[in-house]
């Protein structure tokens, strides 16, 4: 991939001077007027998921990671307070990339969001399963340029941007690219990654990089006694955390938090 630029002794003095000026421009002083983090959503009353940062959603296979993410997406595109757990601070546009599932399975995610919100405005869903890792990366960059109003990029299957999740160099390059995208496009990037079967860690070197660089890591686990119930908890995070909570899939096929709360919204409800 060679995303990391290597030194070239043949570079002209003009090129080196230009790079030095770019580096010096990145100095941060206490008196600088710097834009503060823009948080897109609260869990409970705790701000999470800011633009310019990355989150990780991890869990074993079939733990309902995508269902958990569906609540996140519905709250954002609908500007909802969903079960008083996923509380959007603003209406957001979401570019959702799925790398694992068939077109019909990807469509079902869109249909669930539409049922929860009332429409699918602001949700741009793409299934990139047929592409190679390199072409998936190229496709995502093209889509970010196409959907210029994107606030959140979701990569459901970030390991599919790599040939080998245990390759340290490749993992560092992909994570470096994600950080660059989050900065260049001023977006939040939510990544989904499988968890190791023998422990609670994210899989591979890409998982280690994600743990080190992410603003927050959420783990989704299936209940040990009732397989219809899953739990969401924060295992790593900056700032204040939130209490673990549970959800299940209703008879209508929609995820719902297990509590006494119902859906409310800061804007006129679409239903």
Regions found by a protein language model. Name each.
Residues 56-62, 67, 172-263:
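Phosphate-binding/switch region of NTP-binding enzymes
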Residues 60, 89-173, 249-254, 259-266:
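Conserved inter-motif catalytic segment of the P-loop NTP-binding fold
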Residues 49, 86-89, 117-118, 145-147, ...:
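Conserved catalytic network of the ASCE P-loop NTPase/AAA+ motor domain
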Residues 267-271:
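Acidic, gly/ser/pro-rich intrinsically disordered tails
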Residues 75-79, 113-116, 161-164, 181, ...:
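Conserved, well-folded catalytic cores of nucleic-acid-processing
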Residues 1-17:
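Short, small/acidic-rich helices and loops at N termini and domain boundaries
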Residues 12-113:
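The Walker A/P-loop phosphate-binding site
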């Amino acid at each position: 991939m060679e995303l990391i630029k290597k030194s070239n002794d043949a570079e002209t003095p003009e090129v080196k001077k230009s790079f030095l000026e770019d580096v010096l421009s990145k100095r941060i002083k206490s008196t600088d007027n710097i834009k503060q983090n823009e948080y897109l959503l609260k869990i409970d009353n705790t701000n999470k998921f800011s633009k310019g940062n990355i989150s990780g959603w991890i869990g074993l296979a079939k733990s309902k990671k995508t269902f958990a993410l569906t609540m996140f997406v519905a709250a954002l595109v609908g500007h909802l307070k969903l079960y008083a757990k996923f509380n959007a601070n603003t209406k957001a546009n979401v570019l959702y990339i799925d790398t694992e599932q068939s077109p019909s399975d990807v469509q079902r995610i869109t249909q669930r969001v539409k049922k929860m919100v009332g429409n699918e405005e602001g949700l741009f869903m793409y299934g990139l399963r047929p592409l190679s890792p390199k072409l998936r990366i190229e496709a995502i960059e093209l889509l970010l340029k196409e959907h210029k109003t994107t606030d959140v990029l979701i990569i459901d299957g970030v390991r599919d941007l790599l040939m080998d999740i245990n390759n340290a160099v490749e993992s560092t390059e992909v994570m470096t690219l994600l950080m660059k995208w989050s900065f260049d496009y001023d977006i939040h990037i939510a990544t989904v990654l499988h968890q190791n079967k023998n422990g609670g860690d994210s899989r591979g070197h890409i998982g280690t990089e994600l743990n080190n660089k992410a603003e927050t890591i959420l783990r989704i686990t299936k209940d040990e006694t009732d397989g219809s119930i899953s739990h969401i908890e924060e295992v790593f995070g900056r700032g204040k955390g939130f209490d673990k909570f549970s959800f299940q899939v209703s008879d209508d096929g929609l995820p719902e938090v297990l509590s006494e709360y119902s859906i409310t919204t800061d804007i006129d409800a679409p239903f």
